[in-house]
């Protein structure tokens, strides 16, 4: 019986659900950099999340980025493995979880000789990702979803980040 009671006091969103939602952001594309010096068209793919595992209250994202780079050295294609970290924040008005304070914590680029150019572009990539995720929710509660999800949208008091999940409590 306890499980039934628990259902009414909170709603849990798993990493898998966040990942399915993030898949909708696959192919985030943006032009970044300093035109004429070093700039790139970047496309993000394969975003996956780890919730509260590496660092309490943070979401770690990993993903791939395809880059078409132009620099003083000419045009070049490169691929990156990205690791991002963000703070999940609940927006009650929108009934959505946003990933704020997004930052690139690790980036490896292939071919390796592009690493220097990538270091130049990293602050621009950071800013572009931060702006994007400040506006695009990582997860939106649906009123037409499950009963728990509809209740979460109405009664949510905030969020708690636990390893592997985000819990939305309905009570203080």
Predicted regions, residues:
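Extracellular/lumenal and peripheral-membrane lipid-interaction modules
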Residues: 5-172
């Amino acid at each position: 019986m306890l499980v039934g009671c628990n259902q009414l006091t909170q709603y849990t969103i798993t990493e898998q659900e966040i990942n399915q939602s993030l898949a909708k952001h696959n192919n985030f594309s943006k032009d970044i950099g300093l035109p004429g010096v070093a700039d790139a068209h970047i496309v993000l793919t394969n975003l996956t999340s780890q919730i509260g595992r590496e660092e309490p209250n943070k979401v770690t994202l990993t993903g791939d980025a395809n880059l078409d780079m132009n620099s003083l050295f000419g045009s070049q294609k490169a691929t990156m493995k990205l690791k991002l970290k963000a703070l999940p924040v609940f927006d009650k008005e929108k009934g959505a979880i946003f990933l704020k304070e997004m930052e690139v914590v690790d980036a490896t680029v292939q071919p390796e000789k592009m690493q220097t150019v990538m270091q130049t572009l990293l602050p621009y990539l950071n800013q572009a990702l931060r702006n994007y995720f400040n506006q695009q929710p990582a997860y939106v509660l649906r009123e037409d979803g499950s009963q728990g999800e509809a209740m979460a949208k109405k009664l949510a008091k905030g969020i708690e980040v636990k390893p592997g999940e985000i819990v939305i409590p309905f009570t203080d």
